[in-house]
Amino acid sequence: MLFRAVLLCAALGLSQAANPCCSNPCQNRGECMSTGFDQYKCDCTRTGFYGENCTTPEFLTRIKLLLKPTPNTVHYILTHFKGVWNIVNNIPFLRSLIMKYVLTSRSYLIDSPPTYNVHYGYKSWEAFSNLSYYTRALPPVADDCPTPMGVKGNKELPDSKEVLEKVLLRREFIPDPQGSNMMFAFFAQHFTHQFFKTDHKRGPGFTRGLGHGVDLNHIYGETLDRQHKLRLFKDGKLKYQVIGGEVYPPTVKDTQVEMIYPPHIPENLQFAVGQEVFGLVPGLMMYATIWLREHNRVCDILKQEHPEWGDEQLFQTSRLILIGETIKIVIEDYVQHLSGYHFKLKFDPELLFNQQFQYQNRIASEFNTLYHWHPLLPDTFNIEDQEYSFKQFLYNNSILLEHGLTQFVESFTRQIAGRVAGGRNVPIAVQAVAKASIDQSREMKYQSLNEYRKRFSLKPYTSFEELTGEKEMAAELKALYSDIDVMELYPALLVEKPRPDAIFGETMVELGAPFSLKGLMGNPICSPQYWKPSTFGGEVGFKIINTASIQSLICNNVKGCPFTSFNVQDPQPTKTATINASASHSRLDDINPTVLIKRRSTEL
């Protein structure tokens, strides 16, 4: 009887033991598999390493590691020696060779096909096939692990509100030393909300953006029904209205398209576009209007080139051209600005035609999380000689009509955005969204910052001071988390020490760039089957893509062709910027209308 009791206790003890993979024993992208209740095995297949925990490099791997420079060294080389890079940029063969390396080295870090999601920390058909999930770069921490980060740290993470208040909230506006402006900030928000569309009814691990990439559903609508309501069904064009001699989106009343507006917004100011949340701020509606005009402009060009084409072919081909324009602008203007490189990035799909590359993409929840760049937002928005608070700006399309697109572009080109890394620069007005980002990361059981750094071939941080580059916030973080190996991903990205004169720290760039470039170049239009003139209506359509830039987009669609770029020409804080957000009028209770979208999209 006693023997049976001992056996029963032993069995119960084993069944309640922590998953042996909770300690993340497998290194260098080796995969941990439990074998019994207290044993594990690391699968080192094709990692270039071997041994019990995949820690011993193979011969060729050892040589590669000896020769490979650190990410910070590569960044330094690319952001210095301008004279050398000017020469490289003018030698097509050399420029293409370097660009090919940039694309392949980054894309290699992204699993394709996708592997995990919020509910499956192991390979499964469901994780591969179910498009309603965001994928994951790292599997979630197992439910049977003793602590939120596996085995390290306390059984509970620090209060998210306390983390927010101590190291994330803005004391005073910190401008981006890289000179990013509000044209950049709103482009980022507008562009990414075609694939960051969290389905909050199902949970933060789910998405409503089933295209998982650059499909321009934020222009054309996620569903066929929404698309049809937005289309004119004549000459391939989208519906529009003319106000003061200029083209703007149609109204909700005229299209019967669902948009999110507070009930007090007049019907004539409820513009209807592809993304239902773009009525939130006029900066988003500005870009929505520009792309509406661009689509209809391209339709006119194709109609002249192909009078034999019907409405459907004109519409579909114009959409493909706009996808191409978007990718080119993102790589050659947007990513170019973010990188700070003297090397000129190049959009050329043919660079990958002889490489092992999969033309598919799945958006990762970590990519969504790291893109929460709310520190970009200023305390007030300056248009012409007027200054608007958050409260005045929200759901106010009348500002767009009052000033017009020309003044919007000129003003946002001049107004500097905030620095994202370095801590304490999240505006008070969006603190609820930042807190939700922390809470949702916990709900999705993200692994620690250092596990993500190792996953993307970065050395783990050994202290909070190494993370922040200073002592005050490091001390706050140590009091909150106790162990650097327990530091959460999202807060870490915002407190990480920025690279010299840069908007981001190392982790943001080294995690974000692979997701971004794989998503852009994995688009079907970049494949050998699609990337040819006939796909885009001939040489005329192909030329529209290959000559696209943020400046040409503005010139072709905004009266007067105002100068624009993604950085201010003199990266200094604007004179009208509010100095202290915590003492300004942009308090959270001033922006009650955002309650309307909290359940729909914490990305905003």
Swiss-Prot record:
Q: What happens when the gene is disrupted?
A: Mutant mice exhibit defects in colonic mucosal wound repair.
Q: Where in the cell is it found?
A: Microsome membrane; Endoplasmic reticulum membrane; Nucleus inner membrane; Nucleus outer membrane
Which leading EC class covers this enzyme? oxidoreductase
**Which residues make up the binding site for substrate?**
106, 341
Listed GO biological process terms? bone mineralization; brown fat cell differentiation; cellular response to fluid shear stress; cellular response to hypoxia; cellular response to non-ionic osmotic stress; cyclooxygenase pathway; decidualization; embryo implantation
Which cofactors, if any, are listed as required?
heme b
**One matching Pfam family, short form?**
An_peroxidase
- The intrachain disulfides are 21-32, 22-145, 26-42, 44-54, 555-561
Which EC numbers characterise this protein's activity in its record?
A: 1.14.99.1
> Which residues get modified to S-nitrosocysteine?
526
Induction, as annotated: By cytokines and mitogens.
Q: Which residues bind heme b?
A: 374
| Key word Glycoprotein present | yes
Q: Which residues are the signal sequence here?
A: 1-17
Cofactor: binding comment: Binds 1 heme b (iron(II)-protoporphyrin IX) group per subunit.
Catalyzed reactions per annotation? (5Z,8Z,11Z,14Z)-eicosatetraenoate + AH2 + 2 O2 = prostaglandin H2 + A + H2O; (5Z,8Z,11Z,14Z)-eicosatetraenoate + 2 O2 = prostaglandin G2; prostaglandin G2 + AH2 = prostaglandin H2 + A + H2O; (5Z,8Z,11Z,14Z,17Z)-eicosapentaenoate + 2 O2 = prostaglandin G3
PANTHER family reported for this sequence:
PROSTAGLANDIN G/H SYNTHASE, PROSTAGLANDIN G_H SYNTHASE 2
Subunit note: Homodimer.
Q: What does this protein do?
A: Dual cyclooxygenase and peroxidase in the biosynthesis pathway of prostanoids, a class of C20 oxylipins mainly derived from arachidonate, with a particular role in the inflammatory response. The cyclooxygenase activity oxygenates arachidonate (AA, C20:4(n-6)) to the hydroperoxy endoperoxide prostaglandin G2 (PGG2), and the peroxidase activity reduces PGG2 to the hydroxy endoperoxide PGH2, the precursor of all 2-series prostaglandins and thromboxanes.
Further remark, if any? The conversion of arachidonate to prostaglandin H2 is a 2 step reaction: a cyclooxygenase (COX) reaction which converts arachidonate to prostaglandin G2 (PGG2) and a peroxidase reaction in which PGG2 is reduced to prostaglandin H2 (PGH2). The cyclooxygenase reaction occurs in a hydrophobic channel in the core of the enzyme. The peroxidase reaction occurs at a heme-containing active site located near the protein surface. The nonsteroidal anti-inflammatory drugs (NSAIDs) binding site corresponds to the cyclooxygenase active site. Conversion of arachidonate to prostaglandin H2 is mediated by 2 different isozymes: the constitutive PTGS1 and the inducible PTGS2. PTGS1 is expressed constitutively and generally produces prostanoids acutely in response to hormonal stimuli to fine-tune physiological processes requiring instantaneous, continuous regulation (e.g. hemostasis). PTGS2 is inducible and typically produces prostanoids that mediate responses to physiological stresses such as infection and inflammation.
Per its record, how is this protein called by name?
Prostaglandin G/H synthase 2
Q: Which gene encodes it?
A: Ptgs2
